[in-house]
Amino acid sequence: MSNTLTYVIPQLLAQGLMALREEAITARLVNRAYEPLAGQKGSSIDVPIPSAITARAVTAAVTMPANVDSSPTRVVITLDQWWEAPFQMSDKDLLEAAGGIMPMQASEAIKALANKMDAYLLGFYLKVPNYSGVAGTTPFVSTVAEYTDARLRLNKTLAPMTDRRVLLNPEAEANALKLALFSQADQRGDQGGVINGQIGRKLGADWFMNQNIPVHAGGSAGGTTTLSATMTVGQAILSIGACTPTDGTFAVGDTLKVGTGSTAVYFTVKTAATATASVAAVTVDVNAVSTASAGAAIEHPKGSQAINLMFHRDAFAFATRPLESSSQGLGNIISSAIDPVTGLTLRLEVSRQYKQTTFSYDILAGAQLIRPELACRILG
């Protein structure tokens, strides 16, 4: 295998440029409290979730009342994401290439791993049921209604008021920055938006832009869909009628809103489904915790939709553990470093082969959606 270094030979390259990078910062915004020690591929972290406790009245008596059992649950973070981004250069390449080629290629390698981890983390949106906004319509055209609706969902699910984040794609952020509430200093409260173009902390959340925001390919079923049969507590399959078109589809990760107003219940679609004669049996990710009568309205955002997010830090957990720097490197140079943009812990291994050197950055990580109720999609 040979390299093509036409564009890094000194006579053709006046100045090297570092890699252009996305704002792949999701890992900085989620819970990172589970990274104390180095780990190996396949190891896991148990995250305990406390069980609810009901207060009871105290009545003096000779005997004590019965003890109340508690049943905490757990969510497992498996460290199974092991990725590398290598590049190699021969001795001839190193002699001929401009002095800046090494940091340029290293920057590209780190960028590749950062984007991979960012996409991995953002991919957990598939199990986030709450949503605001309209599918296919970029939010914040004239108001912050999409944000306040998302904030309402987090407030109703008891999300802590601190450590709330908003992640927007470039189009949504551009719309938001046009609003006087964010761009004009007399309404914003400071000059941050005017000077550096960042929204910062506003309306009880920290706002960030991320070019890696995913686009979800939603199913085609729309119209005024309804429950065609009563929804009961613990039910995992919803019977949905009045689908348009009559053979409309529901894709994995689609959201469903059953009912209206303060009693509405949100679900995500677990298994793809297709309607037959306008009726579909749709398996949802979390069993129903309330009832709804047949005929209850169902809202199904359909088609292509950007998945901007509002979430509390503890909705997601992420752990990246440094792969050990071997004391028996067998001639290889192995060291660990932290990417200043994303905060990811990477390992660099430099290995000598026949007349060439291979540079390989790798990462071992894992993540999990710990509390889906603490996140909300802002559709675009």
List PLM regions with ranges.
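Internal mixed-charge
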Residues: R201, A205-P214, T268-A375
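Autoprocessing Asn-cyclization modules and mimics
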Residues: V141, N175, L181-A294, R377-I378
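Signature of extracytoplasmic/envelope-associated structural regions
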Residues: T4, E108-T137, S220-T226, A242, ...
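Short, low-complexity, charged/polar segments at coil/turn and helix-coil boundaries
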Residues: R28-K41, D46, S51-R56, V144-L181
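Residue-level recognition of conserved beta-strand edge/terminus positions
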Residues: P48, V258-G259, P301, D362
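Surface-exposed molecular-recognition determinants
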Residues: N3-A19, M102, Y147-D149, P170, ...
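Long, contiguous amphipathic alpha-helices that act as assembly "spine/axial" helices in icosahedral shell
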Residues: V47, V75-E146, N155-A172, G197-W207, ...
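N-terminal "assembly arms/tails" that initiate or stabilize quaternary assembly
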Residues: M1-L79, A375
